[in-house]
Amino acid sequence: MIEIEINNAQEITSALERLAQATAHRAPLMRSIAGTMESAVAQNFEVGGRPAWKKLKIRQGTPLVDTENLMASITSEYNNNEAIVGTNEPYAAIHQFGGKAGRGRKVAIPARPFLILTPQDEADILEDIQDYFQLLIK
């Protein structure tokens, strides 16, 4: 048989109330997650992809980085229910997923996924979540 002795019921009640409120009002947590995801995407640009993007064939340089337009267009948003990182650049999808582009769709562009999270990024997000709830129960 397991016995639990509670010496300070008020402290436990208070911690449970904070947890209940935090699960109803998640915007601060979503803000943290959005920031972590945006940092991960920035790192993808800084290192030329994770995994590395296919090199340019015709000219020298680093794909998706040389003009910095796509990189500068990355934004994050959050609300009570979600954390979002993305871009509104119309050409972003062809770089993310690859495909045919140009007049007549004759140019093959390889996928260079920049909106991608590594296992370490996912672990960082889980750490954000743990930190958020640990702060609430202290």
From Swiss-Prot:
The lineage of its organism: Bacteria, Pseudomonadati, Pseudomonadota, Gammaproteobacteria, Pasteurellales. To phage Mu protein G. It holds the Pfam family Phage_tail_S. This is Mu-like prophage FluMu G protein 2. It comes from Haemophilus influenzae (strain ATCC 51907 / DSM 11121 / KW20 / Rd). InterPro entries: Phage_virion_morphogenesis. It comes from the Bacteria.
